[in-house]
């Protein structure tokens, strides 16, 4: 009987988890270093942060012995500033913020992934731009982002560059998350 690659990977995965089981058991016995934790988030009402909201609503933090206070900011960049400034312990934000901080010699670690893909979309209102045909039509227009320096701002900048435009060709306005 031949063993398929898939079956072999299953056995290897289970074996690996079994080898780590004692470490998981020991980790659960340890006391928490800190039980009061403040999380800064850049627009908690956004679908981007749904996993955080679900954890809060369902009491997952309390179940783990944590007293979590969530502070909602106008955008991810503002939430990150709260962590850098010391008024929050953790930032729930886009991964690229950790990369941007590295360019400033500040090294923060990402330790949880809330989604498999960016949950940000760009849209043009037919009411405001009924004749929109291409990204070139955005020249001279106002584009709303959650906050300057936020992941929405970065996405807009990337989109503009991909279509031969610069940030200076438009007015990027921080409008918050709501």
Model-derived segments and spans:
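Short, glycine-/small- and polar/acidic-enriched structural segments
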Residues: 29-167, 171-175
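Secretory targeting signals
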Residues: 1-3
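Active-site-proximal beta-alpha loop/turn segments in soluble metabolic enzymes
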Residues: 178
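N-terminal export signals
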Residues: 7-26
């Amino acid at each position: 009987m031949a063993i398929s690659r898939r079956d072999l990977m299953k056995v290897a995965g289970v074996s690996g988890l079994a080898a780590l089981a004692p470490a998981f058991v020991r980790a659960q016995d340890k006391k928490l270093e800190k039980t009061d934790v403040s999380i800064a988030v850049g627009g908690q009402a956004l679908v981007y942060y749904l996993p955080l909201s679900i954890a809060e609503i369902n009491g997952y933090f309390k179940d783990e012995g944590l007293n979590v206070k969530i502070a909602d900011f106008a955008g991810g960049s503002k939430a990150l500033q709260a962590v850098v400034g010391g008024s929050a312990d953790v930032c729930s934000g886009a991964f690229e913020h950790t990369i941007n901080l590295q360019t400033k010699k500040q090294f923060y670690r990402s330790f949880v992934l809330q989604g498999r893909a960016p949950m940000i979309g760009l849209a043009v209102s037919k009411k405001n731009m009924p004749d929109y045909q291409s990204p070139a039509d955005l020249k001279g227009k106002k584009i709303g982002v959650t906050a300057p320096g936020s992941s929405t701002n970065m996405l807009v900048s990337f989109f503009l560059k991909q279509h031969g435009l610069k940030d200076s060709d438009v007015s990027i306005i921080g409008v918050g998350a709501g």
